[in-house]
């Protein structure tokens, strides 16, 4: 079987890891292996391809099982382990590899994210520690269109997180890279663009100012800060050119193309190690190694064959790389460029320099901009209208000037002379100053788009193919049909009698969306934390991705886990009204007796009492929403005292189809009397898995179930959506119904929420 065919089999074999709801067990894997071995005995390329694909499927599934093994066997108790740090902020956040557990070596080492202080030695990468750890499986929030942290953690081979109970340094020496980075950081203290230089040269993005990150995102130039193919290939090219230059003064018998090629590969690996050998850099090195091997084979390979072999080798070496968004961005970008230059090549012309170079750059950047639209929209929910202009400025400055200057300065930093190093750093700093001066002159070009645009985003690919085949001449009806299908989401309207309530997965907090006819209301806005809030991270992106116009906010009470995202949401939709029991300026009242209508739905406030001056959980705004057939009771954080007072005054109006479980399922709420008076069919609870209060309480869950309620909670189900219509109502949970993936599962102990 030829190598490209084998690579194609590998890619096909690993793709199921993206969609499998559960991983096949030992019996299924043994059966697949036996079938593959039986097929190998038969003749024919197709049969051999099926057999090899089956064997590689088994390999991929075994790798996934191995990645999940720590979540089943290393959690649930305090463990003593030896950890080698690979990354640290020097304070309370550390990433590393567990290499020994209770005296036994772990192979492969288990990646872990740790929280806590390491004393007395200051933490740095490369240190070897003996730690007492409280480990737990990775668990992330899951919302439609949101960041998938569980998938990301498994792609990075970090299935565990934990707290440091105790630690002692076995070897406090920092790694060579950490020492070199510290030396470089001290050397660059006086340069204004030192953070960007460290990012471009060493892959250190943590120190980048937020303003620079936002600017690069809005201009579509963030990819330049990732240490991956561009920088590593550039480092390899510099080494190759240097060695080719040296060969000019050597005897003829010592001149050859193999030595510079291998030296370039060695230089790429060395540079990737220097930048921390992150997974994208490691994949780039593997791809370069495959390219070198194909070049050394003496055969001619097409661009598509090289692409297949590189991607196949990466997935065989690391099957979980199939979960990595960065891998697919890189692979899609390279495939798009091959497609662009083969299907829409730049016409041969008589342009002279510099116009020839400028036109070639515009052609290249146009291909990248247009053909990457589907992935960019899917991953980032928007496009940069200024990305083409920004990259026409940034790519030449960074690749031809800034990065070569930085790499050369990093080499000179090892040996001197200091004056040469200073000149190189100064030149790189000035190049970056010019770059960001230009980027800041561009208008804010970031355009947020919703899910309807996903189909339209593949139009550039179809237009290029249609132009080459002249489809508009031969099959105009087909072209019009395809265009109609791509634009169909824009004309599709939800049923007039349908409305939805979605409980977003915001961790230990509450945020619910009521939507109808393309409009939306919020009940609470989730928690906030020092670096951000749920409004920025979850609510605003979710509403925009689903093409919803926010018209109002109901705020249950003043606690931070319920109003944390309020300011961010109001900044995005300043015209939205706010209704709460707090009596704050510009807030509409939410007290017992208040009634209003919105989009044909009836809203009735049941608590707190008018004129009440109480604060806290028992002052929560309780609202009942109904459409005449079905209803839902939103309770905020009321506790038993408020429940009993509300029932004594308003018990006839509490009956509802569903209830939002009060106070995240705390044992101080959800009294048996409330559950009986509501007499609902389902209960929805919002909490985080690892909350300090172990909510929802086991007793509360049993209380609801004993009364016949179906129980749904965001730690288990992720985002929960209830669809109400004339036919009744349905509940769709994201984790186990809409997106049931093996990497979305609840790992570890079934009842562990603490």
Explain the meaning of each model-derived region.
Residues 1-74, 78-82, 243-255, 259, ...:
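Transmembrane helix-bundle segments that form internal channels/tunnels in multi-pass membrane proteins
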Residues 54-223, 533, 537-541, 545-549, ...:
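Membrane-interface helix/helix-cap signal primarily in integral membrane proteins
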Residues 155-285, 292-293, 422, 568, ...:
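Aromatic-rich juxtamembrane segments at the membrane interface
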Residues 272-281, 296-300, 317-327, 374-377, ...:
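Membrane-interface helix caps and helix-loop-helix hairpins in membrane proteins
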Residues 315-316, 320-322, 440-548, 552, ...:
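Core dinuclear metal-dependent hydrolase active-site scaffold
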Residues 550-561, 659-663:
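Metallo-beta-lactamase
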Residues 554, 558-593:
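Active-site HxH/HxHxD metal-binding segment of metal-dependent hydrolases
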Residues 643-718:
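Cap/insert and terminal regions of metallo-dependent hydrolase folds
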């Amino acid at each position: 079987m030829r190598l490209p065919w084998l690579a194609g089999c590998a890619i096909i074999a690993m793709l199921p890891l993206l969609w499998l709801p559960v991983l096949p067990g030992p019996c299924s894997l043994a059966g697949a292996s036996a079938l593959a071995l039986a097929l190998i005995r038969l003749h024919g390329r197709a049969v051999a391809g099926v057999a090899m694909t089956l064997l590689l499927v088994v390999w991929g599934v075994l790798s996934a099982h191995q990645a999940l093994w720590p979540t089943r066997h290393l959690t649930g108790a305090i463990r003593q382990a030896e950890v080698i740090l690979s990354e640290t902020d020097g304070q309370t956040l550390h990433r590393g590899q567990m290499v020994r557990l209770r005296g036994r070596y772990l192979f492969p080492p288990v990646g872990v994210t740790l929280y806590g202080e390491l004393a007395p030695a200051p933490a740095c990468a490369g240190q070897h520690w003996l730690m007492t750890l409280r480990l737990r499986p990775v668990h992330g929030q899951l919302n439609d269109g949101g960041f998938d942290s569980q998938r990301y953690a498994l792609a990075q081979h970090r299935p565990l997180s934990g707290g440091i109970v105790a630690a002692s340094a076995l070897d406090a020496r920092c790694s060579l890279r950490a020492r070199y980075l510290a030396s470089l950081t001290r050397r660059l203290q006086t340069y204004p663009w030192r953070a960007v230089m460290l990012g471009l040269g060493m892959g250190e993005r943590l120190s980048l100012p937020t303003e620079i990150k936002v600017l690069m995102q809005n201009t579509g130039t963030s990819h330049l800060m990732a240490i991956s193919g561009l920088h590593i290939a550039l480092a390899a090219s510099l080494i190759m050119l240097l060695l080719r230059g040296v060969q000019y003064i050597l005897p003829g018998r010592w001149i050859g193309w193999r030595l510079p090629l291998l030296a370039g590969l060695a230089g790429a690996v060395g540079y990737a190690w220097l930048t921390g050998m992150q997974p994208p850099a490691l994949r780039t090195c593997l791809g370069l190694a495959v390219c070198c091997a194909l070049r050394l084979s003496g055969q001619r390979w097409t661009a598509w064959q090289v692409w297949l072999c590189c991607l196949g080798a990466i997935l065989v070496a690391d099957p979980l790389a199939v979960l990595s968004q960065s891998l697919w961005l890189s692979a899609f970008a390279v495939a798009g460029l091959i497609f662009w230059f083969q299907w829409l090549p730049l016409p041969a012309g008589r342009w002279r320099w510099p116009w020839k170079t400028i036109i070639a750059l515009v052609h290249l950047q146009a291909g990248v901009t247009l053909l990457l639209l589907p992935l960019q929209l899917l991953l980032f929910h928007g496009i940069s209208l200024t990305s083409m202009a920004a990259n026409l400025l940034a790519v030449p400055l960074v690749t031809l000037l800034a990065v070569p200057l930085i790499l050369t300065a990093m080499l000179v930093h090892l040996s001197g002379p200091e004056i040469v190093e200073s000149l190189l750093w100064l030149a790189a700093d000035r190049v970056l100053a010019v770059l960001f001066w230009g980027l800041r002159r561009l208008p804010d070009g970031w355009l947020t788009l919703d899910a309807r645009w996903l189909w339209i985003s593949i139009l550039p690919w179809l237009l290029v193919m249609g132009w080459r085949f002249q489809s508009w001449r031969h099959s105009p009806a087909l072209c019009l049909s395809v265009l109609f299908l791509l634009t169909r989401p824009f004309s599709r309207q939800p049923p007039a009698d349908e409305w939805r309530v979605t409980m977003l997965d915001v961790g230990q907090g509450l945020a619910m969306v009521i939507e109808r006819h393309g409009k939306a209301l919020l009940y609470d806005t989730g928690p906030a934390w020092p670096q951000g809030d749920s409004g920025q991270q979850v609510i605003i992106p979710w509403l925009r991705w689903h093409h919803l116009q926010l018209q109002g906010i109901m705020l249950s009470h003043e606690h931070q886990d319920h109003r944390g995202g309020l300011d961010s949401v109001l900044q995005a939709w300043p015209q939205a009204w706010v209704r709460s029991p707090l009596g704050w300026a510009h807030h509409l009242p939410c007290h017992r007796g208040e009634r209003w209508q919105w989009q044909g739905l009836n809203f009735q406030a049941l608590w707190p009492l008018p004129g009440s001056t109480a604060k806290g959980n028992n002052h929560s705004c309780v609202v009942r929403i109904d459409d005449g057939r079905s209803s839902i009771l939103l309770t905020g954080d009321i506790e038993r005292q408020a429940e009993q007072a509300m029932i004594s005054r308003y018990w006839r109006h509490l009956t509802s189809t569903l209830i939002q479980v009060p106070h995240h399922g705390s044992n101080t709420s959800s009294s048996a009397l409330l559950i009986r008076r509501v007499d609902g069919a389902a209960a929805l609870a919002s909490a985080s898995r690892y909350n300090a209060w172990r909510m929802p309480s086991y007793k509360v869950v049993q209380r609801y179930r004993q009364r016949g309620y179906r129980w749904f909670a965001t730690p288990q189900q992720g985002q929960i959506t209830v669809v109400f219509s004339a036919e009744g109502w349905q509940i769709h949970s994201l984790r186990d119904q809409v997106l049931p993936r093996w990497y979305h599962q609840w790992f570890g102990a079934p009842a562990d929420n603490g």
